[in-house]
Amino acid sequence: INLNGQVLLLDGAALDFTQFWQKIYASPQNIFHACSEDIDLIYHYAQQRPLHNVFDTQVAMAFLGHGLQVSYQNALKTCLDIDIEKDQTRSDWLARPLSQEQLSYAANDVLYLMQLAEALKNQLQQKGIYDFVLQDCQSLTKEIAMQTPLDELYSDIGNYRHSRRELMQLQ
């Protein structure tokens, strides 16, 4: 998490996030890059939907003509001329303790996010399209909220490979 320039690494498996979820929903704006998975997890664990105060830098990049799915790494290079390593993307994030490489990767994943967001907001405002990006981000978070209800998530677990009995067990 990047909180006003201070990077904090939190272990979701070891903490109670109840107050944290409340702060996210009360925050004037939460900044993400490619927010879908993060938003889905927030909805699942916070038990609250939808999150309205989102600015997604990937959506902003698309509005500025950089393509629909620009990676965080490429967004940083394009907008800020910053290179970051993405070599830990597929490492085992469930194993504890996390390696120093994983911790550095996690910190870099948010270290430049606010700086990137500010650069993008400036470009969007200059083009007069900032409000359209905010509307699109709000539509995206609503769409994620309308996807599979929490009590039916079991059915998303490769149900085409499971028998009715296995699906009942998952439920």
Report the location of each language-model feature:
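Mixed-charge, glycine-rich, non-catalytic linkers/tails in nucleic-acid processing enzymes
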Residues: 103-170
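Generic low-polarity alpha-helical segments
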Residues: 1-3, 168-171
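Conserved DEDDh/DEDDy metal-dependent 3′-5′ exonuclease domain
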Residues: 1-123
